[in-house]
Amino acid sequence: MNEIKEPYIVQNDGQSVFYEELLKNMLEVVQRLSGNVWTDYNPHDPGVTLGEAANYALTELRYKFGFPLVDYLTEENIPFTPERFGLHSASDVFATSIVTVDDYRKLLLEEVPEISNLQIDYNVSTNGYSISYVEMPFCRDCEKIPEKIISVYNEHRNLCEWLDKVEKANTELLRFESEFEIQQGEDATTVLARVYWCILHYLADDPTSLSVRERTEYELYKQLYKVEGIKCFRTCYLKNNVDSKLQPDIIEEPQSRFKNNSTLLIPSKLEDLARICIYCGNIKVNIDLDRFRDKLEGFCWENRTKKNRDHVPQKALKGTWRPIFEHYSIANDMPNCYGLSSHNANNSFSAYIGLFDWIIKNGLEKAKSLPQMLSILKQDEGFAHSLRTIRQKSKYLDFLDEMYGVESQPSWLKEENCYGESPVGILNRRMKFLRNIARLQKDRAQGRNLLKYDSEGNAPTVKEWFCLLIGATPDDGHLVSNVLPKHNLYLLEKKDKRNDNFQRLDSLLINEKMMDPENVHEVGYVELAKDTDGKRKEYEEMRSVLPFFNENLITGDLFRNGTNLKNYKILKSIDYDYMLVYHHMEYDGWINLGHNTSIDCLERLANILRRFLRELNRECETIYLFEPVLADISRPYEVVIVLPSWTYRFSMARFRDESRKLLRSLVPAHIDGKMYWISEDQMRKFEFYYQQFLATFTNNKISPFRNEILKAMCKVLSYTDPKDIQSLNDSH
């Protein structure tokens, strides 16, 4: 028994060690379990044969699971893309948005190739910017430069920042005068074009590498000496360009230091080249003026267009698709004498073999589904169909949360799942949030693009973050005050002056015997339609059967707390068989919603109403953020945040406090402001003025009234109850 027997099938060296280890362990276990019963090792024993076949299958499985992880995330004909799994590139994750004046300057120089230089002045008292620019030589659309600068600025504008003016700079025009020698075989016209481009580039260089004081004649000369084709300079000057006829008293003098708005006079006629002498040896060479200008124009545009920006190369992680997910049954490796063929596979031994196959197949199927399991893309949202899959995917999303330092499902969102969000719905909401997390973190301080009135995809990043987190629509074009009117409903709050309507809505004539325990039926959960057409038919049925909706009025209490099925009861009445009633949670009183002879019918209607109110609550949730400084420069570092107060979640003190903490963390620290939780009546007026406020930036006819519209919005907010106002100032 101590004799070591070699396997009778020779394996490759890479796998044989693992196979031998499996075989050794198998024999030790069998020997230990059998004791003195099994005294001889025979390769043809059924147990040995089965063990060896299983060991071969495990050895093959080890090979299949030995590839890099990226290969298992690569599907056939679908290349590996890290963003699919929430693994954003380093350039997206660690990139910083526009913050400083230098950031804006570099951005505009990259995005607007028609300018060679610009000066940005920042007014700290108003948080506004003024831009003066220097045109690029040979610019053809000079009149469009201010429009392009304004457009680029507004695409990257931060909260509470605004653009005061854009104007052409008063440039200091310099004339190049020089005698220099070129190398043998060089074209003088081309070399002169290179010299002019070197000077232009130096005068408009990046501010992070050169300050105004360092733009000196000496530094420029060092750059010119490196120009291709230059042998040496005999003289080299940059003089202020003076028109002797208009300014006879001013003398042209060489400049040793250059201003930030300095630029170079480009020769347009031969007389402009009179003070430039180029030699090849001792021979003076001539310049072709037209070809010189063409060459210089080519150099200018070649080096100023966006396509020639220097980018840091990114290492692309690549995966290889592996066709390893098919399993060759262990039964196929067993001799025919065991009767394991497909025609005779119903015996217990075959079922025992099938258990091995099932375990291996199950593992391979899970490995094959790994791309869908870890994907956060919209097309893979339907993959999570079992509770186990949902738990596994939730853990992966938790990992992404920790990696990016965010919470896509904070505890205060989990506490009250009053809108019946399913586990799959929670996953989809978290996936949508994490798909955008790199952009949200990078552009956290970014404001709305004021030049785009169309609100789709155009909102402050703070609003996008908040709305994506709670599952609301992040566009400013979604007007929540239109939600209830679309369904022909009017919200009636208890604090409304028209309290007589409550007397009509409350069923005060309910017989007290109806409230006896034997006459009260709890409302249970009923499965409803999930498709759009099915929902529409159910809502039409609800509106037609429940007479409550004949009033077109709905109390705020019912609107909010009707999202909970426990607040509905079915009562046995005298005149009618059964009544569906709702008990107010915020004040005393009952509402008779309707009656029917069937408990099942009323129970189903209660479930339909509950789902209907959940959808309305969710649709009524949004956030508005506007910057008063855009109309009133005396309020430079202030934002006003407006939210509806009439939904279930938005009426809860805990939810409001946590929302304030989140928004405070998102709004830049130097910006203060207030949060207003306003009623539906206030929101209707506010949204009207807010849309007009946005229109003032694209409609010149109403732009003079911007400040008046701001005052109208602030007046609407002034009627907010003090308990519904929160400060973003943590010191308060």
Task: Locate the predicted segments by residue.
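Hydrophobic/aromatic interaction determinants used to assemble and anchor large protein complexes
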Residues: 1, 691-698, 705-732
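Carbohydrate-recognition loop of C-type lectin domains
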Residues: 1-49, 97-214, 220-223, 266-532, ...
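Single conserved position on a long alpha-helix in the C-terminal lobe of the eukaryotic protein kinase
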Residues: 35, 41, 49-81, 88
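A short, surface-exposed helix-loop junction/capping segment
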Residues: 70-92, 200-210, 638-644
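Membrane-proximal bilayer-interacting regions
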Residues: 205-252, 257
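Negatively charged, low-complexity tracts enriched in Asp/Glu with abundant Ser/Thr
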Residues: 528, 533-559
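A short, exposed loop/beta-hairpin motif centered on an aromatic-Gly-Thr core
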Residues: 537-548, 585-604
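Short aromatic-glycine-(Arg/Gly/Cys) micro-motifs in beta-strand/loop hairpins
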Residues: 569-589
